[in-house]
Amino acid sequence: MRIICIFCVILIMSGCRSVTHKKEVQNHDVLETSDISTDNFEHTLKSDDFDFPVPEISCKIISSTKYKISLITTDSENLEKYYKKLKEGNWQVLRPATSGSPVSMYFNGFDGLVITDSKIDDVGNREVVIDYYNGKRDNSFEYIKKYEDIIRDFFSDDVIYAISEYDISEATTKLGLRGFYVYTDKIEPAKLIIDKYNNIILVNYDQFVISDIDSDGEDELITRLGYGFGRYIITLSAFKYNPKEMVMLCKTQYEQMGSLDMFIRENNGNVEVIAGKQKNGEIDVLGSYGNLEINNGVLRPKKKDIPFKILEEN
């Protein structure tokens, strides 16, 4: 009889705990991981529960407030797809260079959202934190500064921060790289992050820098960087065009103008920027601007008073 009574008490306590857990989730109180059942993904995110958009994915809630939610899910790939499809804002994705790295981070400088995505196991469970930064949306650097320590933790202790063209040149020299500093429509200091694998991770939206190309002369895609705030989004790809020539392809996506292929080409020290299309390994040139030079690892107009402009397709 005593054993039966004890068993009944345990069942009653378990039922009460389950009800309490459900109520806490609905009220967005901070929960401890130990309070979450790990048997299945019963909770589904709903946008009405938060002050920022969230996709309806199955998950386990770790903690939740109106402005921040931590969860475990097997559906983290749809998070990035969901946010990239939103009409407002542009997303930057930060990931370590190694494909097996457990962490990625993507954020929206306008809407003030940061999502960190950490691998838990090999089954597909990932811990995701969605943080709504309700602050200075018009100042992306203040926003990034808040997460600077997080970014350092994600990558390596030897991350180099450059805030000017001279720092960029020094940073690339230290890493044994050649940096290309490209002006768009403003001449302002840039901030970039170079990780220990020599990949460019983050740059100012007004400029971009890429590392040198290391290949055996064959066509080889080595890096792809997409970023954009407002007027245009740039996807930058660097590859070896032939053993004697370096070519960097920039596909510039204007919000209302469509896309344009841009190439930055160096041939025996002569640098030119051309607009065109790549067909069967050849470039069909639509327009060019060749008054450029590389000075201490910096790609710039030969006359400093002439800023480089993104070429527009006629």
Report residues per predicted region.
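C-terminal motif of bacterial Sec signal peptides marking the signal peptidase cleavage site
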Residues: 12-15
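Bacterial signal peptide processing site
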Residues: 17-19
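Acidic, small-residue rich beta-repeat scaffolds with periodic aromatic anchors
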Residues: 21-25, 31, 135-172, 244-246, ...
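Compositionally biased P/S/T/G-rich terminal and signal peptide-adjacent segments
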Residues: 24-70, 135-139
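Terminal, regulation- and interaction-focused segments at domain boundaries
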Residues: 53-97
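Beta-propeller blade repeat segments, especially FG-GAP/WD-type strand-to-loop junctions
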Residues: 184-185, 194-196, 231-251, 289-296
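Calcium-coordinating acidic loop motifs
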Residues: 212-214
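Glycine-aliphatic tripeptides that mark coil-to-beta-strand junctions in extracellular
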Residues: 217-219
